[in-house]
Structure formats: C-alpha cells, structure tokens
Amino acid sequence: LEQEDFEVEIDEKTVLVLDTSKPIFDREPQDFSFFDALEIESAGFGLNTILPALEMASSDDKIIGISIKNMSAAGGTSNLIALRNGLKKFKESGKFIKAYSDGYTQADYFLASIADSIFVHPEGLVDFRGLSAEVMYYKSAQEKSGVTMEVIRQGKYKSAVEPYLFDKMSNENRIQIKTILSDVWSEMVDD
C-alpha cells in the first residue's frame, strides 16, 4: 500500500486506538461493494494494513502513543506475534503503549504484554491455560464404515497420515508436537 492510502487528518497529541475485537488476518479481506448493500461489517483487519500504519505512526510527531483495546485478540499465534513485533517497533520510537480490556485470554495478554501499562476491569477475568494440541483419529470409524486407506509412508517422524492408521498418537508424533508447543511457549514467555 502507498502512503496516500493511509492519509487522514491527525490532531496534535493523538493516541491511536488499536481495537482487536475483530480477527487479524495476514491480508485484509477483500472489500466487495455488495457487502455494503447488505450492511455486513468488515470481517477483520489485515497485517498488510496494520503494520505499515504502525510504521507510519511511529514517525508521525502528532501521534504520541497507542491504546490497545483488547476484547478478543483472534487471529492465530503467528499473526499475534507479527502484530506484537510491529507494536514493539512502534514502542522503540519512544512512544507509549497502553492496553485495556474487560478480560484477557492468554492470546490477549500476550499481545498486551508489549504495553507499558496493562489495565483490566476490576471484575474482569484473566484466563491463562498454556498451550495444547489435539489430534482426531479415524481408524475405528473407518473400520466400522468399511473404508480402508492406502497410505505410503517412509520414516518414523511422518505423522500427517497417523489419524488414518492409528487410534492414538505415536511416541514420535508426541515428541514432535511437544517440541513445537515448547518452542511457541518459549517464544511467548521470552517476549
């Protein structure tokens, strides 16, 4: 996007509000004019719009900070990490970031943790559960329905087809998933 796509009139000492109540996508959803006629609200925001806007805001002397309004930071861990990194760059410009929510999920708090100050409603909820992974297995269902799968697999650490071959997780897949979750958790905690 070009800079003129973002140009708006900004007053002195402006605080930007980042409302995360809608999903955050890699790319902005396409704007189809027929949605306007149906009065359908925007489905969410794209990192391709948010990150350049944060970069421009970091160098705009009229903008003094950002207020993150966390109502449910939906968008997947990778998108939240990218957004948080964009906020970190904004903060490195010497401007403040504040965060407020009626309650924080783990994802909300991860995003808000880049802020200088985090506020929660006095009767709000903070819900941390850690990370988990679930795998659905189909072998028994296939046997009951008479369906058989023809699978070719080489090596122990090839788990994509496991749900069709087994009724439970193999030790190798358990190790892989545990490693991925540990890496993601470490990234979240270290930041």
Question: What would you call each of these model-derived segments?
Answer:
Residues 1-191:
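Small-residue-centered hinge/linker elements
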